[in-house]
Amino acid sequence: MRMDNKKFNFRLACIMGVGGLLRFFYVLFSTIYERQYDIGMIDLDAGHTVSGGHLAYIQYLYHNWHLPDMDPTTVYQFHHPPLHHYVCAAWMKFCSVFIKNTDILEESIQAVPFLCSLLILWVLYLIVKQFALTDKTKLFVMALFCVHPSLILLSGSVNNDAMALLFTLLTVYTTMVWCRTKTLVSLMGIALSIALGMCTKQNVAEMAFPVAAVFLYELIKEWKKSGFPAKRIGHFAVFGLVSIPLGMSFYVRNLIKYNTPLVWVYELAEDSWQYTGHIPVINRFLWPVPTELVDNLTHFRIGCGYNVWMQIIRTSVLGEWDMDGVGRSVKLLAVVLMLFGALLAAWSLAVFVDVFVLRCKKYSIAMPNRILFLGGYVVNMLFYLVFAYRYPQECSMHFRYIEITLLFPAVALGFWLQGTDKTWMRWGAGLLLAAFAVCSACMTIVWGVTAG
């Protein structure tokens, strides 16, 4: 059903506004050291010493304005491509003209992920608009994105996760646009999205595989219809000339200067408290020990950190938040939020298979979009599971590595809800989302009021 444009725009603005306010509240009351990952330290007053972590990387670029002149694998987190860190350093340079208090200047770094988090919502809406969804369904899907805790946590995360997700989503969106227009300009949009994403974080390259599958499908289709597609192959050659040198520049530089492998991952030691390699594979990748799971839930603990699915559920709504110092009521809220999130995820995943595989003809989803969404989900999950297996640490199973997988089942859930004739199902989905949203908002408030 299509709403009046003014009514739809007003409701969309309200939903997006709530999402923006939740992110603003979270950033305003959370410091650059709270609920962060691999950040190290920054101290502008002390001058720069080469220490490790994302904040130290940003400070190095802020002071020196050039890439580190040492083997990046010898300093913690300096092996990451530098685009996010350069943008943060440039933002600090700009702010330093007006801000003389170094504590405030250091905290201003959060403006970059906050802006990325708002742009993420905008690009998500652009993607949702590409599908034949009703206005009510679009609002439902956008509400899910706006209140999801993992996307709220990104708004204050000073590492490169927010910018990486932004470029990954731009890759999806520009690919969908190219499938419709087939112009060289739209193709360059894909090239820049992937390349700049790889200049931000290496795992953005995972979306190149489903994009390549879409290219191959369109090439074969055009060849069958119109003969040898010389013009299209020429366009793809230009695509490669733009995306490969730019996207691979940092990695090739390190290979030439320091003999660093093109794919290099920092590994924690086996004596780390996060190590899970001693746990049976069946408990890591299928199900946790049942008695331990029940005991954790009944005592409001977030445990079974060795199990990949429990870690996905937990970190998708709570990150790696250490809850040892919080009260029983907050732990109860965390468990309820986790359960609502798990229900939404399970429902969405089930209908994702139904919409994009089993009954795709009913929903009239174009083949390129099916390839992109199915391929995007499967490829990202496969890389994630292989990564978790090869590097058996709790941090290797964090949901932030696969946040793009929020998109694909959420869109499928929208299609399924508008296609079902069961009113109680639609009401049930709405109530579940409302409960999830309330718990998410309450948890965001808890994070704010308990911030240091």
Each model region followed by its residue ranges:
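Transmembrane-helix signature of polytopic, membrane-embedded enzymes
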Residues: 100-104, 124-147, 166
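Perimembrane helix-loop-helix junctions
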Residues: 177-180, 207-244
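Membrane-lumen/periplasm interface segments of specific transmembrane helices
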Residues: 234-347
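Short acidic/glycine- and proline-prone juxtamembrane loop motifs at membrane-interface regions
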Residues: 150-164
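Membrane-interface transmembrane helices that cradle and orient dolichyl/undecaprenyl
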Residues: 130-132, 171-187, 197, 219-221
